[in-house]
Amino acid sequence: HRDLHSFPTRRSSDLEGTLDDYAYAIQALITLYESTFDVKWFRLAARLQDSQDGLFADEAGGYYYTPRDAGHLIARVKEFFDGAMPNSNAVSALNLLRLHRLARGDAYRDRAMGIFRASSALMRAHPSAFAQMLVALDFHLSPPFEAVIARGPAPNEAVRAAAALRRRFAPSLVIASGEGVPMAEDRPPGAEGFLYLCRDTACLAPTADIEAVLSALEDVDVYKLDA
């Protein structure tokens, strides 16, 4: 099915969506969920990712730029190089890895690995043209930071805590709060606070001390390119 709409008319569009349309929309929805913790955005991101997989995926790895039923084309292409905008396969790789963390779904990670495999030879030969793909690869290789904000008594407490967490540069950080997202399940407020911070498989005790969590987020891997 097609998910492309025209704004501000809010009607379905007759145009066929491309991989760009899906990848950028999913990226925005995941970020919107992590900013508002409204589970409908997470669910919509997951639904659109399922649609993208069905319409664009190549089982050999990566995504074609046009949908599988675009019959008027002589050939379908897969693009991996960044242009004026980040490449949509690279954006998709990071989307899939973020969904893997939030949904605890290995299929998302497997799709991301397929993108890396399909683009690896080109990435090694032309790394400067793969900035967004390298961002996604760094996310995959870095031990992940996961912050779960258990619902507290104040309605906007989770949103305020998330805004504070984003004051630190932590590119592998994923944030979840509320019901309906597997990463946030089984995380009730503790006696000492409502904020859980985990790196890899090790978690700090729940705390209300945002500054302590911000200090922990300073432990970010730094990479230096050889001259």
Feature roles, as predicted:
Residues 1-2:
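Short, well-ordered junction/capping motifs at the entry into regular secondary structure
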Residues 6, 10-227:
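Glycan-recognition and catalytic cores of secretory/periplasmic carbohydrate-active enzymes
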